[in-house]
Amino acid sequence: MADRRNLFFFYGDDKAKLVEKMKPIYRILEENGFTILDHPKNANAIVSVGDDATFLQAVRKTGFREDCLYAGISTKDEISFYCDFHIDHVDTALQEITKNEIEVRKYPTIEVDVDGSTSFHCLNEFSLRSSIIKTFVVDVHVDDLYFETFRGDGLVVSTPTGSTAYNKSLRGAVVDPLIPCFQVSELASLNNNTYRTLGSPFILNHERTLTLKLRPDGNDYPVIGMDNEALSIKQVEKAVVRLSDKQIKTVKLKNNSFWEKVQRTFL
């Protein structure tokens, strides 16, 4: 990151308060040859200040840029999955950066195409959920294979890094982010003598395509989740999901691996 000198800071809640707290850090950065920008266009490093939700917003609002490094500064009690640095210890982090004690990790994203007219990327997960109190019916296809008809509240498709988020609360597997794949998990599936789904999460490799075709039974106005944002589309017939070639480059400490974060968060 030492050669990435043009920084843009993205803030979540309490921006004015956090900017004031970051001013001494700005001075230290400028004294060390960094430039603080007011707009991300010319930045080659984008720093989110907040929590993991802020980091997801920073990536989305700046267009999932592959020519930038992304870094997260936590304002909470401790560092998190996307935030390797803490706002109270940024000066220490700067020393680690100058001593080359950091690594750049590439995180995969998924690409979603809705009805051939709307497409977007997700760093954590894509979710498709019922917007009314009625069973959601979706025909699930893997590549050209009709796999199953899902009935329930919805489906969540997660990346490896997103496997520790919404997916984990659905009893999905935690997946090493070095494995190029994506995972499909169910939301309250309906399983009885008449209707049957796989009943468990399943993982697809990077060459697979997942197609979700909605049955037109009055529930074709779903809630579409893009990480921590909702997309409003009046009518949806199908969504096609693939692992994207687009990867997000993030800055992490050498002594703070993905599995160390998992251990610290859940064990």
Curated annotation (Swiss-Prot):
This entry's Enzyme Commission designation comes to: 2.7.1.23
Q: Which reaction(s) does its UniProt entry say it catalyses?
A: NAD(+) + ATP = ADP + NADP(+) + H(+)
Subcellular location per UniProt equals: Cytoplasm
Q: Does the keyword Kinase apply?
A: yes
Q: Name one GO molecular function term.
A: metal ion binding
Supply the SUPFAM superfamilies for this chain: NAD kinase/diacylglycerol kinase-like (SSF111331)
Biological process according to GO = NAD metabolic process; NADP biosynthetic process
Q: Which UniProt keywords apply?
A: ATP-binding, Cytoplasm, Kinase, NAD, NADP, Nucleotide-binding, Transferase
The active site annotation covers: 52 (proton acceptor)
GO CC field: cytoplasm
| One Pfam family hit | NAD_kinase_C
Statement: the UniProt record of this protein carries the keyword Cytoplasm:
yes
Enzyme class, UniProt record, top EC level: transferase
List of residues binding NAD(+): 52-53, 124-125, 151, 153, 164-169, 188
**Signal peptide feature range:** none
Indicate the principal place this protein occupies in or around the cell.
cytoplasm
Q: Which cofactors, if any, are listed as required?
A: a divalent metal cation
What does the sequence similarity comment in the record state about its family? Belongs to the NAD kinase family.
User: What biological function has been recorded for the protein in this entry?
Assistant: Involved in the regulation of the intracellular balance of NAD and NADP, and is a key enzyme in the biosynthesis of NADP. Catalyzes specifically the phosphorylation on 2'-hydroxyl of the adenosine moiety of NAD to yield NADP.
| This protein's name | NAD kinase 2
- Lineage, top ranks: Bacteria, Bacillati, Bacillota, Bacilli, Bacillales
